[in-house]
Amino acid sequence: MTERDREANEYVLGTHRVELLRLGFQHQVWAPFTSSLWQRAGFGPGQRILDLGCGPGYASFDLAHLVGDAGEVLAVDMSQRFVDHVQEQAECRGISNLRAEVQDVERLDVAAGSLDGAFARWVLCFTSDPAAVVAGAALALRPGGRLAIMDYCNYRGLIVAPHSPEIDTVISATFLSVTRRGGNMDVGQDIPAMMRSCGLEVQSVQPIVCAAQPGSALWRWPETFFLGYLTTLLEMELITEDEADGFRRVWT
């Protein structure tokens, strides 16, 4: 991908076709956890739900089926390319209760009290002002509406056994790279306080801890991210070529 192909509001790994496929695989891996979150939030038929930072819309499509024809999903993202993809796929799939818009989630433009629910997955960790995202979503919720968030809480808690310094180096560099971009890969620790400051009642906090075997889908999920992100870490001079090669050798 050339610089000319890049969007002004680029994702960490871009918005090109390879990233579409990676995000699709990611959604498949995490769909059971996501569906469980929606169930606990009470999302269901006839509701109006906001998908914050929808990306290419994989969760948005599932939400559209969940709320049914009597409901509606508003999917917002900073990427015009991803929003176009959502709209095209919705038309191809005959999904008429899904609307996608280009919006900055830190400056949400949704009518106050117009939503039954809002959802964000791995969005707040990449924003420079996650409290503004939470506040905007809270304002858009009707009384009794629910905000459901899935995000990282202890990113450097990702470990492999036996211990690998090569993998530790890349995990730490990834954490630092997001910090330099204004994000926080441990944002989950702060989300409950953000919610309370907006007048929301925190009803549930559920940690997700998983163990994966090499070759499994859950193992391949971080693999697809890290192997693609090594180039960015090299460009940011957060790792060396030898460290990148060491990660590839150990992980694969």
Task: List where the protein language model places each region.
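C-terminal helical/coil "lid" or tail adjacent to the Rossmann-like core of SAM-dependent
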Residues: 12, 18-19, 30, 203-252
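Conserved catalytic/acceptor-binding region of the Class I
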Residues: 148-216
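A short SAM/SAH-binding and catalytic strip from SAM-dependent methyltransferases
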Residues: 116-130
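A short glycine-rich, Lys/Arg-flanked "PGG" loop and its adjoining helix->strand segment in the class I
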Residues: 131-146
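A short acidic, Gly/Pro-enriched loop at the edge of an enzyme's catalytic core
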Residues: 108-117
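Conserved alpha-helix/loop element of class I SAM-dependent methyltransferases that forms part
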Residues: 28-47, 62
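N-terminal, positively charged/glycine-rich alpha-helical extensions of SAM-dependent methyltransferases
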Residues: 1-20
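Class I SAM-dependent methyltransferase SAM/SAH-binding core
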Residues: 50-52, 56-107
